Amino acid sequence: MQSTLTRALALAIALAASGAAEAASTTFINPVGPATYSSADPFVLRHTDGNYYFVATSENWDKIELRKSASLSGMGVSAPVTVFTKSATACSGNNCYSKDVWAPEINYINGAWYIYFSASGSDDQHRVFAIKNTNADPTTGSWTTPVKVADTDDAWAIDQTVATINGQLYMAWSDISGGQPQRIKLAKMSSPTAIIGRGAIVSTPTNAWEQVGAKVNEAPQFIVHGSKVHMSFSASGCWTDDYKLGLLSANLTADLLNPASWTKAASPLLQQGNGAFGPGHNGFTKSPDGTEDWIVYHANPASGRGCTNYRTTRIQKITWNGDTPVVGAPVAVGTAVTRPSGEGTGTIWYRIRNEHSGKVVSIDRGAPANGAQIWQFADFGNTDQRWSLDPVGSGYFKLTTAYNGNVADVYNFSTAPGAYVKSYPYAATTNQQWILVQTDTQYFKVRNRNSGIMLDNKDGSMLDGGVIQQWTDNNLAPQHWLFERTN
């Protein structure tokens, strides 16, 4: 067993180093969408009631689910409310919503809630639709039957967004018409469900980086800063790793329906990097205190995933170069990100679920607190099954239990495969420090800093009480762990 002297020395080192690492209460990790399934085409609205309202394309493209959250980084935690389901009977024509329910967006306009989305019938004639709810809380009350929202062309349309700019309501969307590729169309609206006349084409995929896989401009989103209005858009095929964001900019006082008013940035606003493939289809929102701008987008965790259910929602803070937004490279998943300003400092808790067994990391509460075996058990919501990720520097975390404040510790500083993981007070030693390693799904591998090997469900146990150990990396399901945020 670890000697008292070794423990005392480690504790002294810990006290000397205290305060150097950022506390878990001030950080979160991406992805932030629902932990157990995908969340492509995310959109988040920060409302005046202090809540965030989150929608995304559902896995089966068959419904719209709405989540309400008091925090931006915790938007994927709450249970979803289904507010729309595709029509049960297949149909054809340009007035159908029996399949391909894509890219919902929620807005609050003139005292009512609207969710816009695109859908189609059996002949893939995609159009934009809107549903309305007059209840104060959109997760309650009823939503109206969908109404089609189209300009006079009434052509193929997806990925709509609406915004009020200088007192005028606009809609932008992705259009295919006249034998042309996907382009961005923009129009004024006379009401939240009525477009005035014919939309103007304001962006066409002309750059090489907009043409990977296909010539595509889609998923426009507005953000206003100072004297400029910007419109981000997604470029290239979503089925490629090179799906990315571009940026259009115009003077706030310009005629926005004049294509000449818009200037396209020569380089992408956001593209693949740091293990994020095909980042795109974004939204913009504010921090809880309104002082920061944040971008919300989806990306894949591995190459070749395309427009599938591997896409997850990520967020990161925007900075500004004058009135021009700067996003930078995608933030790597599983790394500590400072929480949005005004979000609070309450500890963020996770359940850590094993991919192989479906059980969660727990502590043998019948054993003495110091040295108690860490094992897996069915999730009962107990405090020994809730863990915080506390950054300790260089990308590493300590895994702290809500049960008694102890941390996950590789017993006796072992570097050998098969060494047990136990519960001990934190002493700032490397056998108590772990880094999250991205896999090709939402699961992580968890590597110990001291030994360099992985957190492991011993022998792939399916049983309650299955021992948690460390083992050489084999990239199998007993070494894959899902961090499911619980608050």
Task: List where the protein language model places each region.
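Lectin-like carbohydrate-binding module/patch detector with strong preference for beta-trefoil
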Residues: 344-487
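Non-catalytic nucleic-acid-binding interfaces of large nucleic-acid enzymes and RNP effectors
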Residues: 13
